Amino acid sequence: MKHLTLLLISILTVSVCFAQSDDDRWKKKYINLGFIITTMSQDGLPDLKDNYGASFTVGRTFYLHRPIGGVLRFGIDATWFDINYTNYKIKHITYWGTDNYQYHQGEVSMHIGPSITIRPVNKLNIHGYFRYAPSFSALYANDTFYGNYATFFVGGASISYGVIGLGFETRFGDCKYKELGSDGDEQSSFINKTKHNGWKAYLTFRF
């Protein structure tokens, strides 16, 4: 009886360890470092294409069920924070000469949305997602700071082997900037909404 009890305990321990080990292969946490290509536009004005941009993202995937067929899981992605910075160079040509100046634009946001993860082989993970990204967007232009709430959406996919991988993401949204510190009247904001549309490529670390 004693030997049977020890055998059952051993089998249970091995089963639990195997389940934990298998679950660990489904990486939940992610840290992304990316570069951005984006366009900022307003009705009636020329589109502005970025000079360069960068991003930093931290989040986690919450899986909704055990693996289907051992290879497929659906989940909810929660990005705790996503920081994006974009630099624009503007050349203003007039009769009297050419002026060069810059816009600095950025967002701080959180994301939430559905995702799908496929693990066809042991360490290979393919992850696809679409997220709603409420943001605070800021713009420094003409020696003035502007900012406001912005609505963004992001969608993309990544492929990783073990801890490290590569990803691609499209992002789009709009914002009506207002001068920070002003009384919020119409003269202190841009006349039209500013639209942002672009993509990012990123290096991802999953744990």
Show where each model-derived region lies.
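Short loop/turn motifs that connect adjacent beta-strands in outer-membrane beta-barrel proteins
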Residues: Q20-K28, F62-L72, R119-I126, S160, ...
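Transmembrane beta-barrel architecture of outer-membrane proteins
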Residues: N51-T57, Q105-H111, Y149-V154, H196-K200
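Flexible, solvent-exposed loop segments that connect beta-strands
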Residues: T38-L48, W80-Q105, S137-N148, K176-K195
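Detector for outer-membrane/organellar transmembrane beta-barrel domains
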Residues: T79-F81, E107-T117, V121, N125-S137, ...
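Cleavable N-terminal export/targeting peptides
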Residues: M1-K27
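Predominantly the C-terminal beta-signal and adjacent terminal strand-loop region
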Residues: D24, I31, M40, Y146-F207
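Short glycine/proline- and aromatic-enriched beta-strand/turn motifs that initiate or cap beta-hairpins
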Residues: Q20-H65, H196-F207
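Membrane-embedded beta-strand positions of outer-membrane beta-barrel proteins
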Residues: K29-F35, L72-A78, I112, G128-F130, ...
